[in-house]
């Protein structure tokens, strides 16, 4: 069996898919015939999401971090880094890495979920706020600017807080940004 992932729709109506580690596209104008685009540089990708412009997609690799692939440039880079191995205390590390990336409608930002360090989000493990779960995924938003973000760095500005600024946003499902 093949591993098939739906990546998303381009602005011109092309549906992009990955079949194992090959990038495929289909469109109504081509009678929905699958067309090979190129071989992807990784075989451990999941949670793929395409930007609205149809030029880039973000995904999670087996290393539990977010990566970006530029289709036109045929290039890729690691978007996030954090400690995911050797977990001894859920309040210290991003135990599950980063998940479920999604682009803003203009492609300038990437939103995803992650499990922030206790020191970065002081209320993240307050049972009165988030219940008794050991780990809480938070909404994280970063610029799509070609840089790798170290999510273990203090005050890196990636955790999204609502206007009242008291508690971060808990996010457990795929993000859809319209």
Give short role names for the model-derived ranges.
Residues 1-178:
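Sequence signature of WD/YWTD-type beta-propeller architectures
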């Amino acid at each position: 069996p093949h591993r098939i992932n739906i990546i998303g729709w381009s602005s011109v109506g092309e549906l992009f898919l990955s079949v194992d580690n090959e990038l495929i596209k289909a469109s109504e104008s081509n009678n929905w015939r699958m067309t090979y685009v190129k071989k992807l540089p990784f075989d451990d990708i999941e949670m793929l999401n395409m930007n609205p412009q149809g030029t880039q997609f973000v995904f999670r690799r087996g290393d539990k971090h977010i990566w970006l692939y530029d289709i036109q440039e045929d290039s890729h880079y690691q978007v996030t880094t954090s400690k995911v191995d050797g977990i001894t205390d859920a309040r210290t590390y991003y135990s599950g890495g980063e998940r479920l990336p999604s682009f803003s409608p203009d492609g300038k930002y990437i939103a995803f979920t992650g499990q922030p360090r206790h020191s970065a989000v002081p209320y993240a493990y307050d049972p009165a706020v988030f219940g008794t779960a050991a780990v809480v995924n938070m909404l994280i938003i970063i610029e799509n600017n070609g840089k790798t973000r170290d999510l273990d760095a203090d005050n890196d500005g990636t955790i999204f807080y609502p206007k009242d600024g008291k508690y971060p946003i808990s996010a457990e499902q795929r993000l859809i940004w319209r």
